[in-house]
From Swiss-Prot:
Signal peptide: none annotated. Residues 1-10, 22-33 have a biased composition (Acidic residues). The gene is Ankrd45. The lineage of its organism: Eukaryota, Metazoa, Chordata, Craniata, Vertebrata. One of its GO terms (biological process) is cell population proliferation. This is Ankyrin repeat domain-containing protein 45. Its main location: cytoplasm. It comes from the Eukaryota. The keyword Membrane does not apply. It is found in: Cytoplasm; Midbody, Midbody ring; Cleavage furrow. Disulfide bonds: none annotated. It comes from Mus musculus (Mouse). SUPFAM superfamilies: Ankyrin repeat, Heat shock protein 70kD (HSP70), C-terminal subdomain. One of its GO terms (cellular component) is Flemming body. Residues 1-42 are annotated as: Disordered.
Amino acid sequence: MEPEETLESESSEKSLFSSQQEYEESQEAEETGAENPLLQPTLTGDVEGLQKIFEDPEHPHHEHAVQLLLEEDIVGRNLLYAACMAGKSDVIKALAKYGVNLNEATARGYTLLHCAAAWGRLETLKALVELDVDIEALNFRGEKARDVAARYSQVECVNFLDWADARLILKKIITKSSLIITDPEKGPGKLFKEDKSTILNACRLKNEWLESHPEASISEIFEQKQQLEDIVSPILAKMSTPRHFAAS
């Protein structure tokens, strides 16, 4: 199911997920016949051609390469959205090297991740997540990319984004637990040396587990999350308990 006419009446949302052909036509119309020179290499996945434009000072479009890349159509889409619609993950990876903001959103809050999710471009989603885009970004409906994928019945994309979210949750808990040690104000009280060591070791082991298990299932990830919480929670509870000292 392609997200073409199933969106609601807001014209900008319809246009955001219009067909690749319509995207090209809109670009040509806006440029009054002068097509954006980055459009074709973006849509065809010509990474070498794009790199030449960005890296060869002698190329006629080199000086304005970033400006051309970020040039928006009437609904606020630049060529990165075209790459997402076309499923050109290699193009996204290549263009990311030139300092573009992969989290930038249209006026209605649609990010590249939302776009790739709506179109069912699984490999593009994977590339964007690998590049650390914000998977929690919300559009004007309050939808994450995962919700948009579900709306268009992009099952593989939903499953992948659920998996990416599970990894993010574990990373956040690791970070929060580490902050108890590195930033004492984040904790509820004074931390004993042995407890500090316990938390540090647990966080280190969970980070190592994440790095060494890139294909871990959602249930395995949540099992690791639970293990970490089972270690940290009793320590936090102990820190929160008032200490009573015997009178001398």
